[in-house]
């Protein structure tokens, strides 16, 4: 093992009430990260969020259990290309819209780079939604329990523990010490693979709902007695998170404590960590987890002492998180495909050639049409308009193609992302970038994971002078194309 088991076994569960008063933290030097570049909390319309998530498309669901979950989280993109995560609550979760808004506003005042911050909310009719920063690199649960390419390294696990402790200290200092159901699914990884704490846990899943949705084996003992979550309950949950990091498994605290008391440490530590840490470091992390899991809430540490304890344990401080995780950095330059290169250069002629060669191959499974019984002369006329549009598109008669494609779309008998993409390019050829952007966004509504829709948005945004947004859209297109090619 990476730590000497004989020395670790000499450790038994020790309470350290004095430790909760340790003072030095790493947060003071981190004030630069209080989210000053983020927009202020705002209220969104349901229409805006519906458009951002392509009509709450199932392809955009990023939460555990998919559509079966009582509260579903979607990824989305606003008109300004900012990527967002949208949590849509069960319709009966928050009947009092005023109470929901007050809670959301309070959480929305928090801004810290250790968190996936809350950007806004929506409370139209029975709809209750939260809007947060989108974190593209999955959850801690994914990287710990369901890893594919490599297990998480010891140095990265320590970094996760520190960052989450710092996030909890920040929230506590801002008067939001209660965090509901802290677990590995609440820890997210940003563009640079740095771990962040989801803001969603700062609000209950409903006005009167439970604070813990996980198995009762992981629930703080006082919550089982009283049904109330306290700041000390959050520390208990942090202890279960440390167990996850130590073991690489979601191990019940009672079982972990039994292993520690029996000095059977080898059964607790993830075998993937062999050779990565010292006996002293392993002992210290187990000691810290045991303190967090004390039965008596008053014997648990507070967030400040967690930060103090975690700072000396940090390893490979100069190594970026994305390197430790084996994930490409957001700043790294991924080679663009020929289409991506053409969009980067705004080479409309090259884009036209690629779309012409592609034809309607990407419409498979995305385009919809009426049933056989609904075939009518009207539909045949509509299809004829599409064919005429295709001929005009092939011969670079772009104004004519716009007219034909528009009549096809207005016919309403079939929905085709490729038609919208082709008309978008025609608008660009005719120096109508706003119309081109609208069509590219509509193509993405129909086919949320289609890279060409993002690429065309990038070209249109560049033509509109929105270079930052264009860069973000180009990056999204490249990521979607890479993901598609891996399938």
Swiss-Prot record:
InterPro entries for this protein: BSK, Kinase-like_dom_sf, Prot_kinase_dom, Ser-Thr/Tyr_kinase_cat_dom, TPR-like_helical_dom_sf
Domain Protein kinase: residue ranges: 59-325
Compartments where found: Cell membrane
Entry annotation: catalytic residues: 181 (proton acceptor)
One Pfam family matching this protein: PK_Tyr_Ser-Thr
Main location, first listed in the record: membrane
Catalytic reactions on record: L-seryl-[protein] + ATP = O-phospho-L-seryl-[protein] + ADP + H(+); L-threonyl-[protein] + ATP = O-phospho-L-threonyl-[protein] + ADP + H(+)
EC code: 2.7.11.1
Keyword field: ATP-binding, Brassinosteroid signaling pathway, Cell membrane, Kinase, Lipoprotein, Membrane, Myristate, Nucleotide-binding, Serine/threonine-protein kinase, Transferase
Cellular component terms (Gene Ontology): nucleus; plasma membrane; plasmodesma
Membrane topology per record: Lipid-anchor
Gene Ontology MF terms: ATP binding; protein serine kinase activity; protein serine/threonine kinase activity
Alphabetical GO biological process terms: brassinosteroid mediated signaling pathway
Lipid linkage positions (N-myristoyl glycine): 2
Record's keyword annotation contains Cell membrane: yes
Binding site for ATP: 65-73, 87
PANTHER family attached to this UniProt entry: SERINE/THREONINE-PROTEIN KINASE BSK5 (PTHR45863), SERINE_THREONINE-PROTEIN KINASE BSK7-RELATED (PTHR45863:SF2)
Protein task: Probable serine/threonine kinase that acts as a positive regulator of brassinosteroid (BR) signaling downstream of the receptor kinase BRI1. Functions redundantly with BSK3, BSK5, BSK6 and BSK8.
Assigned protein family: Belongs to the protein kinase superfamily. Ser/Thr protein kinase family.
Record-given protein name: Serine/threonine-protein kinase BSK7
Organism annotation: Arabidopsis thaliana
Taxonomy of the source species: Eukaryota, Viridiplantae, Streptophyta, Embryophyta, Tracheophyta
